[in-house]
Swiss-Prot record:
<dbReference type="Pfam" id="PF02639">
    <property type="entry name" value="DUF188"/>
</dbReference>
<comment type="similarity">
    <text>Belongs to the UPF0178 family.</text>
</comment>
<protein>
    <recommendedName>
        <fullName>UPF0178 protein Ccel_2994</fullName>
    </recommendedName>
</protein>
<dbReference type="InterPro" id="IPR003791">
    <property type="entry name" value="UPF0178"/>
</dbReference>
Amino acid sequence: MQILVDADACPVKDIITKNAKKYGIPVIMIIDTSHELNDGYSTVITVDKARDSVDIKLINMVQRGDIVVTQDYGVAAMGLGKGAKVLNQNGLIYSDANIDRLLFERHLGQKIRRAGGRTGTIRKRSKENDEAFEKALLLFIKPESEGPRDLKI
């Protein structure tokens, strides 16, 4: 098991690294050339700035049982399809039970924006978001004797 992170705009890199170190889990942070990252623990892979290059690299690397951190529903769907455990930066655990709805909502939002509409505002990140993320991450990485490894939603 390893943790693969779509790290370009990921606000929880420190939380991932802290917990991965604690449990001895390798972390791969994937970024494009417009970002720099060195946390002293993670393997950092830098890819071209081309559209979806980080996403494609991540999905090509993921294996069954890996943990994927992404806020991209398309990446989440492909990760689930490859047998990964997938969550976003706010602790939302993607699953077969919710990914179709999330992809459909993304599609509707894109249609509204293309037609000139607005779909909402982005809330400022909170301490509660970080806590929810860490709790969800720990569900996936704690040894079985300490807690569940698989969560069905």
